[in-house]
Amino acid sequence: MKSSMPVNIVVAHGLEAKALVKMLKLERHQGSSEFLEYSNSNKLRLVVSGIGKEAVAAAVAYLGEQQASADGEIRAWLNVGIAGHRDAPLGSAWLGNKITDHSSGSSAYPPQLIEGVRVGSVVTVDEPETSYPLAAAYEMEASAFYAEATKYSTAELVQVFKVISDNLENPISEIDLKLVPDLIAAHIPQLLTLIEGMSELVEQHNCSQRLPSYYHEVCSKMRLTVNQRLQLKRLCQRYKALGLEAELAKVAGLKGGDAKQLMRQLAERID
């Protein structure tokens, strides 16, 4: 397992968490009194949100605000849970490459950058689905999870993974809840591939977006307005993108000089 896995996993029910807690060696995290949380030393976090769109949106917002980084670093987000399908075999599973909110009719299309994991459609409903009109995984959280998590991360770093627990021949009313951990556990290899792949993607993103130390030095030594901080951030990112990060140190301004003059100097060197 990778040493650094900056991924937030969100499940609706404690039974969905059970296999993940064991697989990822997570321990109870004493954080919110509202949500059951787990974490490990590899930066993984898991939160049990409760069932439904409002509950999952609240859990995502709670974690997202708690983890907001001044450096602009982000984390990956993964929703894991059970779902129903018209005729898919029990225990089959896929990543949602199309997530449709049934009540609004709107759809989202999470970009798929990780190979080796099956993909398919997911439909989020407000009440348990029993007729499964479309060839899709029916569940109650994905659309709200995706909408909220993409406020804190990029689209390709927000994914949903659904395991089929019921279908027309095995209706939702007959689900044996004690089997839910086993349904999730059967996909441990796929989930580990997914989590490790997402970890690599988020680390690549954060490395490319990480601000040069010059930015923090200027902010600590000069009085900058909010707009000037944003301007400085954009300029530093441009220098980094152009491979000119070393040139930043050559620009005067770390001794309490004029902020407007500093911005002009920085802009002139790359215009």
Where are these regions (language model features)?
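Polar low-complexity intrinsically disordered regions
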Residues: M1-S4, G72-E73
